[in-house]
Amino acid sequence: MGRKKKLPTGVSSGVSHASSAPKSVGGCCVPLGLPQPLLLEEKKFLLAVERGDMPNVRRILQKALRHQHININCMDPLGRRALTLAIDNENLEMVELLVVMGVETKDALLHAINAEFVEAVELLLEHEELIYKEGEPYSWQKVDINTAMFAPDITPLMLAAHKNNFEILRILLDRGAAVPVPHDIRCGCEECVRLTAEDSLRHSLSRVNIYRALCSPSLICLTSNDPIITAFQLSWELRNLALTEQECKSEYMDLRRQCQKFAVDLLDQTRTSNELAIILNYDPQMSSYEPGDRMSLTRLVQAISYKQKKFVAHSNIQQLLSSIWYDGLPGFRRKSIVDKVICIAQVAVLFPLYCLIYMCAPNCRTGQLMRKPFMKFLIHASSYLFFLFILILVSQRADDDFVRIFGTTRMKKELAEQELRQRGQTPSKLELIVVMYVIGFVWEEVQEIFAVGMKSYLRNMWNFIDFLRNSLYVSVMCLRAFAYIQQATEIARDPQMAYIPREKWHDFDPQLIAEGLFAAANVFSALKLVHLFSINPHLGPLQISLGRMVIDIVKFFFIYTLVLFAFACGLNQLLWYFAALEKSKCYVLPGGEADWGSHGDSCMKWRRFGNLFESSQSLFWASFGMVGLDDFELSGIKSYTRFWGLLMFGSYSVINVIVLLNLLIAMMSNSYAMIDEHSDTEWKFARTKLWMSYFEDSATLPPPFNVLPSVKWVIRIFRKSSKTIDRQRSKKRKEQEQFSEYDNIMRSLVWRYVAAMHRKFENNPVSEDDINEVKSEINTMRYEMLEIFENSGMDVSSANKKERQPRPRRIKVWERRLMKGFQVAPVQNGCELDAFGNVNGQGEMQEIKVESIPSKPAKETAKERFQRVARTVLLQSTTHKWNVVLRAAKDSQIGRCTKNERKSLQNLGRAIEEAKRLIMLNPGCPSGRESPIRIEFEDEKTSTLLELLNQISAEISDSEKPKIRPIWRPPLKTVPARAMAANNTRSLTAPELKISRKSSPAPTPTPTPGVSHTALSQFRNRELPLCPSKLIANSAPSAPTAPPKKSAPTAPTPTYKPTTHAPFSVEGGNRENTRASDGVRSDNSNFDIHVVDLDEKGGHLGRDNVSDISSIASTSPQRPKHRN
C-alpha cells in the first residue's frame, strides 16, 4: 500500500471525518456537517484535553502531526473541540499548546468570550491577527452553520457586549472593533431588501442581536460621552421597535427594561445634590448651571418624554423635586393637617388679591412668592375651582334666584319680563365671567404650545381634554352669537317672535345646540379636576387607574360596537314591517302629529326597531335592562317571527351582557392590578409630570388674569433683546466649562458603576464552577508534577495506588457520551421484512433499516410498472412505516438490542453463568475481600460487573491457598515474570480473574527492528481496559478440566471506519505481534493502543502500551530510554 494522502487539516484521507455521505453508527444516520463518530485515539485526545493532561496531549499532537492518523480538530458528539474544552476549563496552558501545535481555532474566540476567559481571548485575538488574510472570512465565520454554537451574524464585540464583560469589551474596542449600526426597521436600501429576501428570520434575529449588544451597559459606558441620554434614546427606540415588530416584542421590551435599569443604576451612584443638579440641568444649548440659579431640569424633561418611569421615580430625584416644589414655604411638610388646611384655604380665598398684587408689583415679596411652584399650583387650582363654582351657578340660574331674594321691585319686574321673553336674550353676568375664563384657557394653551412645542403638547393626554373643553366652549360662544343675531332679526320683523315658548322651537335651533354643547363642556371641565388628584398619594393611584381603564374601554368599545351593529341589522330586517304598523297607529292626528294620549304604547314600540339607528339604541339600552320582552309584542307579528326575534335578542344578551361586559370588568381589574403592583412608581411619575408643569417658566397668573396686561408684560417686551444678547454671551463663555464639569461627573458615575459591578461580582458566593475550576487546576498540576518526577528518573508508579478521584456529575456524563459514541442524530426506524412479515426472515429484529424505494428499470412491462408504483406508495405510507416499527419491537416495552449490542448481551449472560460456576466451586469462600484489580474510566455498568467478578475470583483463590498472598498490581506498572509464573500456576487450581495485557510466557522479549527493548520490557504487562466481552472471551478462567484457550490472533491493520469501530472493545495483543510502525490496530472488537514517541531525528525510540483511557488522567508514561 502506498502512503496515504495528507489533507491540509492534518488528517489523512483514510481517516477523514468529512466524508461525502452521512455515516451510520449504532442505527443512527449522522447528517453532513454534524459531528462524526470518533476514533478511540480521538476520544483519548479529547479526554486528555478535558482533564488537563498536558504531557499526553503534547505526545498525541506530536504523533498526529507526524503520522496524520487522527483528526486533531475533531469534535465530540455535542460539537465541542479540544480548544473549546480547554477554554471551558480555563486552562490557559492547554489553550496555548493547542494553538501552537496548529489546532484550528474555528469559533474558539467566541467560546473564550462566552466563557469570559480574558487571557484566552487575548491569545486568540493575536493568533487571529496572524492568520487572517484580507478579503477572506474570519475563523469563526468558517464554521459549519450546522455545528456552530453561535449565530453567523455574531461578532466578538457583539458577544462580549451580550456578556456585558467590561474588560473584554475594552480590549476589543482598543483594537478598533465596532458594532454594526442597525438599519431602521422600515429601511428600503438594497442591503436590507436583499437580506430580507434571502432569509427574513435571520435578518430579524440579526437586528435583535445588534440591539442586544448596543444595550450592554459596559458598551454604553465605554463608547458614549453621555450614557444617560444614550440609555434614554435606546429605550425609546426599542419601544418603537416593539410596537412595529410584534414578532420580537418580548425581546425588545426586555432590552428596554435593561436600558432603563442601567440609567437608574448610574443615578444610584450620585452622592451630592450638586452632582445631581448638574446632571439634571445639563443642556448643551444653554449656559451651565450654577448653584443658586433656577433649575431648568432639562434631563428630567427628557426622561419624562422618553417615559423613564423608574428613573423619574428614583428617590434621589424625588428628594430634589420635593425641595424645589415646597421652596418658599419652609416647614410646610412638617405642619399638622389642620395647619395645612388653614394655609391652603387662606390662599384659595385670597387668590384674586395675590393676582392683583403680582400684576402691579411682580418683584415684591408677595410677587416673588407667587412664582414658587407650590404657590403657583395653589393659585391656579383656586382659580379653577372658582371657575367650576361659576359653572354651577350658571347651571342653577343663581343670578335669577339672587334677584328674586335680594332684588328690588324693579329688578323683579325685569326678571319676570325676561322669563316671558325667551328669545333674543343677551348673556348674563355669570356667563360673561365664563367667557373671560374661556379666553384665558385658550390663551394659556397657546402659550404652552409655543413654549414646549406641538409634539410635547400632544404627548400629555390631559391636553386633549383641555383642547376638547375649550373647543366646546368656543363653539357655544359662536352658536350663541349666531342665535342672538338670528333671533334679533326675527324679532325686528315680528316682535311677537320673542315670546315663542321653548317647546315650540325648532329641534335644531342654534341656541338649543349651544346649550347641549355647553353641558358637554361642563362635564369635561369637571373631569379636569381629577388631574389635581396626582398630588395626593391616596387619590393619585386611583387617577392613574382611571386613565388605564379609559384605554380599556376604548379597546372594548370596538368589539362591543361590532356585536351591537350585527344584531341591530338582524332585528331591524326582521321587525321593520311590524314597527311600521305601530308607527301608523301612533301618528293619527291631523298634521301627522303623534297621538300619545290614546296610542302611547304604539308611539314607544315603533321606535324600538323602526330603523337601524333606533334598533342600535334599543340594544344598547338593553344592556342596562331598559328594553324588555313586551317591546316584541308588535301589531300583527306572527309567532314564528316573534320566536326568531326573541332568539336573536336572547343571543345578544348572552354575548354582550354576560360575556363582553364581564370581559370589560376583567380588563379593568387587570389594569388596576398592574397599577397597584407598581403604584409607587406610577404615582411618582404622574406627580412629577404635574410638578414639572409648574417648574417651567410659564404664566404665573391663572385664567382669567393672564389675559389682562401687567407691569411684567410691559417690562418683558423692552428687555427681550438685551436678555437674548446676554444669554448668547454667557453661553459662549461657559460652554466649555459646562461640558468639562458635566463630563467629569459622568466619568465619575461610570467609574463608580463599574467598581460596584466588580464588587458585586467578587461578593458572590462560591459556586460549583469555582470548585470545579480548582479541581481542574489541581489535576493539571498533578500531571505536570508526575511528568517532572518521571523525567528526573524517579519511580512514580506508586502514584497509581491512590483510589480513583471523584468526578463531578457533568464530567461523568460527558465522558460516558464520548466513550459510548453518543451522536445527536435521529434513529432510522425501519427493518427488512420477509414474505411472512418477520424481521429479516427470522422472526426477530437483527437491525433496523429503511427499505429503499425501488428504482425504475430500463425495460419493464405494464405489470412490473404497476407493481413498482404500488410498492413505492406502500413504502411511503405512514401506516407502513409504523407497522414496521411495531413488528420490529415485537410488542416489547423495551425493544430488542441492535446488532452491535448483541455481543455485549451475550457476554453479560456468560459473565452471569461464569460467576455462578465460580461460586459453586467453593461455596464457603470468605467475603469482604476487595479485588486487587482496579478498572478506571469505565462506565458504571462495566466497572461494577468487572469488580464483582474479580472479587469472586480473588475470594476463591484465597480460600483454596490461604498461605499464598496475592500480589497487588497497580495500573501501568511492570509485573515481574516471577509473579506472572505464580499466577499461571495458581490458575490451574483456582483461577484468579485478572484484567491485564496478554503476553507470551517468555519473560524476555524477542528483538524487533526499530523497537526499543527497554520500552517493551518496561510496559509489556501494563493492564488494559477490557469490556465484558473481552473479559469473558479472553481473560475469564475456565473449569480445571477445560482445555486452555488459545491466544488471540493478531489484529489486522485498521481501516478506521466508524461503522466498524466499537468503543470499549480494547484488548492487548501478544508482545510478538506488536509493531512500532502501527499506531492503532483494530478489528471489530480488539484494539492495541500505543503512543509512539520519536527521537530528535524522527526515528522510533519505542512503543508505550497505554493501558486504558484512564492512563491519560492517572499518570503520564515516561519516554523510554535506551539501555546499553
UniProtKB/Swiss-Prot annotation:
It is a multi-pass membrane protein. Residues 710-728 are annotated as: Calmodulin-binding 1. Residues 362-373, 453-512, 570-645 are extracellular. Gene3D superfamilies: Ankyrin repeat-containing domain. It comes from the Eukaryota. The chain crosses the membrane at residues 341-361, 374-394, 432-452, 513-533, 549-569, 646-666. Changing W713G: Disrupts Ca(2+) inflow through the channel. Calmodulin has little effect on Ca(2+) flow. One of its GO terms (biological process) is cellular response to anoxia. Residues 1-24, 978-1013, 1031-1124 are annotated as: Disordered. Keywords: ANK repeat, Calcium, Calcium channel, Calcium transport, Calmodulin-binding, Cell membrane, Cell projection, Ion channel, Ion transport, Membrane, Repeat, Sensory transduction, Transmembrane, Transmembrane helix, Transport, Vision. Residues 10-21, 1035-1063 have a biased composition (Low complexity). The keyword Cell membrane applies. NCBIfam families: trp. PANTHER family: TRANSIENT RECEPTOR POTENTIAL CHANNEL, TRANSIENT-RECEPTOR-POTENTIAL-LIKE PROTEIN. A light-sensitive calcium channel that is required for inositide-mediated Ca(2+) entry in the retina during phospholipase C (PLC)-mediated phototransduction. Required for vision in the dark and in dim light. Binds calmodulin. Trp and trpl act together in the light response, although it is unclear whether as heteromultimers or distinct units. Also forms a functional cation channel with Trpgamma. Activated by fatty acids, metabolic stress, inositols and GTP-binding proteins. Binding of calmodulin to binding site 1 is Ca(2+) dependent, whereas binding of calmodulin to site 2 is Ca(2+) independent. Forms heteromultimers with Trpgamma and, to a lower extent, with trp. Interacts with Fkbp59 in vivo and is found in the inaD signaling complex. This is Transient-receptor-potential-like protein.
